[in-house]
C-alpha cells in the first residue's frame, strides 16, 4: 500500500528503461513535477537527472531536506516575529511527509483564545491542523502559529494564511466551548 496513489514507475539502468509492471502500471522514464507549479510530464535519464529535474519542478524528493526546510523556515519566521518555536520534531516529520514543496507561513489567532489552557490550544493546533505553536519572549503561548503550505502562492501566501486563520478560529472556538 502507498500513502499516495501510485501514478508511474521509473525503472532505469544505464540510461535505458528496464521494463516491468506493477499494480497495472508499466515502467518508463517519465515523471511529473508539482501538480500546480510544474504538472507537465518529463523524461529522466538517471537518479541525478531525476533529482535535479524534480527540484526544478518544485518537488523536494528527500524527506530530510523537507524537514530541514520546515524547521529552519519556521524558526526564522518565529525569530522575525520576536517569538520562539515550540520544538516538535514529530510534527515537523509528519508535515514533511504531507508536502512536496514546503513553504512555512506565519499566522495568528484571536488573543481571547489564550484564556483556554495552552495545552488545549497546542493540541488542537497540532492534532487537527498540523500547525506548529509559538511562544512569546516570556515563554507563554503566543497567539500565532506556523502552517506549511505545499506551494509558493502568487500573493505571498496571504489567502492561504487567511484561510488557515479562519479554520483555526472555528477549531479554537470549539475548544473554548468544551473547556468552559
Locations of regions flagged by a protein language model:
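Amphipathic alpha-helical "coupling" segments that flank catalytic cores
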Residues: 1-180
Amino acid at each position: 500500500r502507498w500513502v499516495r496513489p501510485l501514478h508511474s514507475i521509473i525503472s532505469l539502468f544505464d540510461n535505458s528503461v528496464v521494463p516491468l509492471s506493477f499494480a497495472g502500471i508499466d515502467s518508463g522514464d517519465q515523471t511529473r513535477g508539482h501538480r500546480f507549479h510544474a504538472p507537465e510530464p518529463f523524461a529522466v535519464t538517471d537518479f541525478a537527472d531525476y533529482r535535479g529535474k524534480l527540484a526544478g519542478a518544485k518537488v523536494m524528493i528527500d524527506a530530510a531536506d523537507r524537514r530541514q526546510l520546515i524547521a529552519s523556515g519556521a524558526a526564522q519566521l518565529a525569530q522575525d516575529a520576536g517569538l520562539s518555536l515550540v520544538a516538535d520534531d514529530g510534527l515537523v516529520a509528519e508535515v514533511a511527509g504531507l508536502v512536496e514543496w514546503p513553504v512555512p507561513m506565519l499566522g495568528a489567532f484571536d488573543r481571547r483564545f489564550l484564556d483556554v489552557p495552552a495545552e488545549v490550544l497546542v493540541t488542537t493546533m497540532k492534532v487537527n491542523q498540523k500547525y506548529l505553536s509559538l511562544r512569546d519572549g516570556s515563554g507563554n503561548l503566543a497567539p500565532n502559529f506556523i502552517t506549511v503550505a505545499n506551494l509558493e502562492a502568487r500573493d505571498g501566501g496571504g489567502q492561504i494564511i487567511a484561510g488557515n486563520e479562519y479554520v483555526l478560529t472555528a477549531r479554537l472556538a470549539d475548544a473554548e466551548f468544551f473547556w468552559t
